[in-house]
Amino acid sequence: MSVNRIQLSGKDILEKDFKTGIRGYSQEEVDEFLDVIIQDYDNFKQEIDRLKAENEKLKKSTPAVEQSRSRSQQPPTSQVNYDVLKRLSNLEKAVFGKRYTEQEES
């Protein structure tokens, strides 16, 4: 909902006067209904203000969250080095182990 599209405020609704006719609406019923509408408007305004504040807070915290997330996704360098060395060792065993057994059979 865009702020530019809001046409009434709680005060506008409260101050609205309706013309009465011979068989018009019950003024008491209209007043009660308008009171409910005013309460809703006030509640919506409070909710919008709360959500705007929460939105600003989240916008400010987003860079910090992204930085901590990127740090947590990267494994420690020592772990990466260990994994690479283990793979290299297994590869050497596979390559040189086959050559060694082939030489013994000949």
Swiss-Prot record:
InterPro entries: Cell_cycle_GpsB, DivIVA_domain, DivIVA_fam
Keyword list, A-Z: Cell cycle, Cell division, Cell shape, Coiled coil, Cytoplasm
Coiled coil (residue ranges): 34-67
GO cellular component labels: cytoplasm
Subcellular location, record wording: Cytoplasm
Biased composition (Low complexity): 70-79
Region feature (Disordered): 55-83
GO process annotations (BP): cell division; regulation of cell shape
Pfam families, A to Z: DivIVA
Family label: Belongs to the GpsB family.
Function comment: Divisome component that associates with the complex late in its assembly, after the Z-ring is formed, and is dependent on DivIC and PBP2B for its recruitment to the divisome. Together with EzrA, is a key component of the system that regulates PBP1 localization during cell cycle progression. Its main role could be the removal of PBP1 from the cell pole after pole maturation is completed. Also contributes to the recruitment of PBP1 to the division complex. Not essential for septum formation.
Listed HAMAP family: GpsB
Quaternary structure, from the entry: Forms polymers through the coiled coil domains. Interacts with PBP1, MreC and EzrA.
Protein name (Swiss-Prot/TrEMBL): Cell cycle protein GpsB
